[in-house]
Amino acid sequence: MSDNNGTPEPQVETTSVFRADLLKEMESSTGTAPASTGAENLPAGSALLVVKRGPNAGARFLLDQPTTTAGRHPESDIFLDDVTVSRRHAEFRINEGEFEVVDVGSLNGTYVNREPRNAQVMQTGDEIQIGKFRLVFLAGPAE
């Protein structure tokens, strides 16, 4: 209740972010993916992006559609809310069973394993940087 004459206060929307043990393992690993990443539980032909660094560290995004968009636009499949991210920054595409990240004309570019890339087929453990966000790619079992 509020003190403003019986009018209820507007509810504030909140988001909770839970950090996964995976992130800690990846930080301390010596370049190899941890033995158990949770990717083995993914549906066949899908993959997972885990935010390693950025305002929503620990968030996970399932890649199970032919094209998944990432950017600062509110209608992006992966909404990355920061000025370092373009409105329409990158797309994650499935091509013949392989996952590819494609920069779609962003201002700051898209990086895979700290190298600038316009397009790159991803492998499990690859780090994708979009603005100040760093995401780790984990592939599920092949179809």
Swiss-Prot record:
Give a yes or no for keyword Cytoplasm in this entry.
yes
* SUPFAM superfamilies found in the cross-reference section: SMAD/FHA domain (SSF49879)
Keyword tRNA-binding in the entry? The reply is: no
Q: Which UniProt keywords apply?
A: Cytoplasm, Phosphoprotein
Q: List every position bearing Phosphothreonine.
A: 14
Q: What is the purpose of this protein?
A: An essential component of the PknG signaling pathway. When unphosphorylated, it inhibits the activity of 2-oxoglutarate dehydrogenase. When phosphorylated it does not inhibit 2-oxoglutarate dehydrogenase.
Name of the protein in question: Oxoglutarate dehydrogenase inhibitor
Its lineage opens with:
Bacteria, Bacillati, Actinomycetota, Actinomycetes, Mycobacteriales
